[in-house]
């Protein structure tokens, strides 16, 4: 789908469709008022008859409006004037895209980016419109033999901005929005792949393909089980021991900083391509969704694509910690004591608390890069879902400034995170009689104790942990990967690169 920006008056638009807003109760937006005046009161007469109230998401499609050059006008409800918030704005864009797609409009000029959204500028409105449009049109049908496509799909969207001086900001918003959307799509596609296709080897092949596509900036190397053994990554290896599929850690290194010696930002993604729970096997119901236990790795892959497409002036390393947790004669057991790469020992009390075992060795491995900071992304705990539901990602960190940066980026991107505490009392829940620590700390505060476990392997750098167990995928009728938190991390890196879109 093609996007562009322009600045012009609505009466001069010659398009398949013009999209304008209507407020409650039956109040025309400034652009709609201009169209109403040109059409000799045609639109306001319809509203007086009660055709459209103006509630958020209501639509009314008008054909061949008098004196209007465009074929159609789509009126869409935007709620109460000057009370339109970020969530409602995205709902309005989503409804607009679905309506245009369903009615066969192949192109449209959208004036919704001129609406007032509290605290948001033109860059934000255009970029969110692009990202929401791409999200709305996303489908995963690669594995279907019969692909159903719209009769006349929407192909072109033009966003109108109030003044010509905002054109540059709008164009930059489209560039950033398309790149972030590309990363989100890549993460969703990876997440939605079935585990018989998407194993650690598949993740490695995708990482290599990304390096091939952006060979100027990205190099990829893959570390297999033999090298992991030599490195002493015994916790990582234990998790994959029950699977026939080899555990593979894919390391993608992007160099975009003009100073090649600048310390890198390291992103680590949990890549459990299927998590049966191991010997502590999961219930059968819903186990199919454990293909999504690699959404942390999918996120990191998607973010690396965004970084490369935008050619950000940063050094970034993305690590996909690929593995599969299966029961079997060679699987690790409850009661085992593992010596991690760091030398610390872990008593295994539950083999279904495996993500932290893969991550702890990966977090030790990345010390060699002398990172500026490290962020891990993982579908780590059901406890985080209980705490924050499916709307907000859990954030924990050993570095306050980094945590504040991530929270700020999450608000900018509309991909929200919430910080949870990590005080000393939680660490005590991990005490073990037989090792330096246990791999679980009991039911209370499970998301926090999991982060406390990881923090014991991150003492040499600034670190943050994103628990995406509640936000990485949806269940039910809308089942599928969400691509979160690609938008959050992309915004964090855009901010770091000084490209945050503030005018």
UniProtKB/Swiss-Prot annotation:
Q: Which domain of life is it from?
A: Bacteria
Q: Which family does it belong to?
A: Belongs to the peptidase M17 family.
The keyword Heme is annotated on this UniProt entry: no
The places in or outside the cell where this protein is found are: Cytoplasm
At which positions is Mn(2+) 2 bound? 270, 275, 293, 354
Q: Which UniProt keywords apply?
A: Aminopeptidase, Cytoplasm, Hydrolase, Manganese, Metal-binding, Protease
One example of the protein's molecular function in GO is: metalloaminopeptidase activity
Provide the taxonomic classification: Bacteria, Pseudomonadati, Pseudomonadota, Gammaproteobacteria, Enterobacterales
Q: Does the keyword Disulfide bond apply?
A: no
**Cofactor requirement:** Mn(2+)
Q: Which Gene3D superfamilies match?
A: Leucine Aminopeptidase, subunit E, domain 1, Zn peptidases
Summarize where Mn(2+) 1 binds, as residue positions: 275, 352, 354
Provide the active-site residues from the annotation.
Answer: 282, 356
NCBIfam families in the cross-refs: PRK00913.1-1, PRK00913.1-4
Question: What is the protein name stated in its UniProt record?
Answer: Probable cytosol aminopeptidase
Q: What class of enzyme is it?
A: hydrolase
InterPro entries with a match to the protein in the record: Leucine_aapep/pepB, Macro_dom-like, Peptidase_M17_C, Peptidase_M17_leu_NH2_pept, Peptidase_M17_N
Query: What's noted on cofactor binding?
Result: Binds 2 manganese ions per subunit.
Query: What is catalysed by this protein?
Result: Release of an N-terminal amino acid, Xaa-|-Yaa-, in which Xaa is preferably Leu, but may be other amino acids including Pro although not Arg or Lys, and Yaa may be Pro. Amino acid amides and methyl esters are also readily hydrolyzed, but rates on arylamides are exceedingly low; Release of an N-terminal amino acid, preferentially leucine, but not glutamic or aspartic acids
Tell me which Gene Ontology terms the entry assigns under biological process: proteolysis
């Amino acid at each position: 789908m093609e996007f562009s920006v322009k600045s012009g008056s609505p009466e001069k638009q010659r398009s398949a469709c013009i999209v304008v807003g209507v407020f409650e109760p039956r109040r025309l937006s400034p652009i709609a008022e201009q169209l109403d005046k040109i059409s000799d009161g045609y639109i306001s007469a319809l509203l007086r008859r009660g055709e459209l109230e103006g509630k958020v998401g209501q639509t009314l499609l008008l054909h061949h409006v008098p004196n209007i050059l465009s074929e159609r006008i789509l009126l869409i409800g935007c709620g109460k004037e000057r009370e339109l918030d970020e969530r409602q704005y995205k709902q309005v864009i989503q409804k607009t895209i679905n309506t245009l797609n369903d009615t066969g409009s192949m192109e449209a000029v959208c004036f919704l980016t001129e609406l007032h959204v509290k605290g948001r500028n033109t860059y934000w409105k255009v970029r969110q419109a692009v990202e929401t449009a791409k999200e709305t049109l996303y489908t995963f049908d690669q594995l279907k033999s019969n692909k159903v496509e719209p009769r006349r799909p929407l192909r072109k969207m033009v966003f109108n901005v109030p003044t010509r001086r905002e054109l540059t900001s709008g164009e930059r918003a489209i560039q950033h929005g398309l790149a972030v959307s590309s990363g989100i799509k890549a993460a969703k596609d990876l997440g939605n792949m079935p585990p018989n296709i998407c194993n650690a080897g598949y993740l490695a092949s995708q990482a290599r393909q990304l390096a091939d596509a952006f060979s100027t900036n990205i190099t990829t190397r893959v570390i297999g089980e033999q090298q992991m053994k030599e490195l002493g990554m015994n916790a990582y290896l234990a998790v994959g021991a029950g699977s026939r599929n080899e555990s593979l850690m894919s390391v993608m290194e992007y160099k975009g900083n003009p100073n090649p010696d600048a310390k890198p930002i390291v992103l680590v993604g949990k890549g459990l391509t299927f998590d049966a729970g191991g010997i502590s096997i999961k219930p059968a119901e819903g186990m199919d969704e454990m293909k999504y236990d690699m959404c942390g790795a999918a996120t990191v892959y998607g973010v690396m694509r965004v970084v490369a497409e935008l050619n950000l002036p940063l050094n970034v390393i993305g690590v996909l910690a690929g593995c599969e947790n299966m029961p079997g004669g060679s699987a690790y057991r409850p009661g085992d004591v593992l010596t991690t790469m760091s030398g610390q020992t872990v008593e295994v009390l539950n083999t279904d608390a495996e993500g932290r075992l893969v991550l702890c060795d990966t977090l030790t491995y990345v010390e060699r890069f002398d990172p500026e900071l490290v962020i891990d992304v993982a579908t780590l705990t059901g406890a985080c879902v209980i705490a924050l539901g499916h709307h907000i990602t859990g954030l924990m960190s050993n570095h306050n400034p980094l945590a504040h940066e991530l929270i700020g980026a999450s608000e900018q991107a509309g991909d929200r995170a919430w910080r949870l505490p990590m005080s000393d009392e939680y660490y005590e829940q991990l005490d073990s009689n037989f090792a330096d620590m246990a791999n679980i700390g009991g039911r209370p505060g499970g998301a926090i104790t999991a982060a406390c476990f990881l923090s014991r392997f991150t003492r040499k750098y600034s670190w943050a942990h994103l628990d995406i167990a509640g936000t990485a995928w949806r269940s039910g009728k809308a089942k599928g990967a969400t691509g979160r938190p690609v938008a959050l991390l992309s915004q964090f890196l855009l901010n770091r690169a000084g490209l945050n879109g503030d005018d």
